[in-house]
Swiss-Prot record:
The gene is rlmH. Pfam families: SPOUT_MTase (PF02590). Keywords: Cytoplasm, Methyltransferase, rRNA processing, S-adenosyl-L-methionine, Transferase. Its EC number is 2.1.1.177. Belongs to the RNA methyltransferase RlmH family. The keyword Ubl conjugation does not apply. This is Ribosomal RNA large subunit methyltransferase H. It comes from Caldicellulosiruptor bescii (strain ATCC BAA-1888 / DSM 6725 / KCTC 15123 / Z-1320) (Anaerocellum thermophilum). Homodimer.
Length: 154
């Protein structure tokens, strides 16, 4: 199973449709669970660290022992699609659930990052949250298409 935990919701219909399309395509190979965490109101907190700690509590209650945790972080390592697919393959073959965590525009707490088995960066560029979720779905689909030998990845 692949679980995607993200802080914030998708508001634009076209981003939502793209995610749903990739979820449908992925369903032939793997079950996908998506968990959206409500973004905290910045105005309620004295500092960002406190806000991130509150979001971390909400995120980590959905993380189970034994899952392979991939935290999406701009300071993580960058992988090729083939390298990414190899990480997916190893964990799928060992029957491990894979959990991806996407933070809010404020990022993620160090507590969440410490739980990661892999800190993964898609780029040094900054992406809108909604678009990034589509990119993540696409790369998961691409990775699995490499594993299962479909013609999607060229």
């Amino acid at each position: 199973m692949i679980k995607i935990i993200s802080v914030g919701t998708i508001k634009e219909k076209y981003f939502l449709q793209a995610c749903e399309e990739y979820k449908k395509r992925l369903s032939r190979w793997v079950k996908v669970e998506e968990i959206e965490i409500k973004e905290e109101d910045e105005n309620k907190y004295f500092n960002i660290e406190t806000l991130l700690e509150k979001e971390a509590d909400k995120i980590l209650k959905h993380v189970k022992e034994g899952e392979f945790i991939i935290v999406c972080d701009i300071n993580g390592i960058e992988l090729s699609s083939e390298e990414f697919s190899e990480i997916l393959r190893k964990n799928i073959n060992s029957s491990k659930n894979i959990t991806f965590i996407i933070g809010s525009s404020n990022g993620l707490s160090n507590e969440v990052k410490r739980r990661a088995d892999l800190l993964l960066s898609f780029s040094k560029l900054t992406f809108p949250h909604q678009l990034f979720r589509v990119l993540l779905y696409e790369q998961i689909y691409r990775g699995l298409s490499i594993i299962y030998g479909t013609k999607y990845h060229k």
